[in-house]
């Protein structure tokens, strides 16, 4: 078990919605709802790229990451 601190206004909001449930149950439900909403937002984008487009995009992202890493390493080496 852990102790957490929350603002008074957040506590009052949780108190309003908790009913007979524990704060842990309410927080867990809110987290699950949030994750569910996030999954649904992400799922709507599945399948919008064909295989070739997806590979091309992945390659571009990898190249951008490599350039960014190189740029950061170069800048850090100047210190």
UniProtKB/Swiss-Prot annotation:
Transmembrane segments: none annotated. The keyword Transmembrane does not apply. The keyword Kinase does not apply. Keywords: Toxin-antitoxin system. InterPro entries: Put_antitoxin. It comes from the Archaea. Possibly the antitoxin component of a type II toxin-antitoxin (TA) system. Its cognate toxin is VapC12 (Potential). HAMAP family: UPF0330. Belongs to the UPF0330 family. This is Putative antitoxin VapB12. The gene is vapB12.
């Amino acid at each position: 078990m852990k102790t957490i601190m929350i603002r008074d206004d957040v506590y009052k909001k949780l108190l309003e919605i908790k009913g007979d449930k524990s704060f842990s149950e309410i927080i867990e439900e809110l987290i699950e709802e949030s994750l569910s909403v996030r999954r649904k937002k992400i799922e709507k984008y599945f399948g919008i790229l064909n295989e070739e487009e997806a590979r091309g995009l992945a390659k571009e992202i990898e190249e951008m990451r490599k350039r960014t890493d190189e740029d950061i390493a170069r800048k850090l080496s100047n210190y």
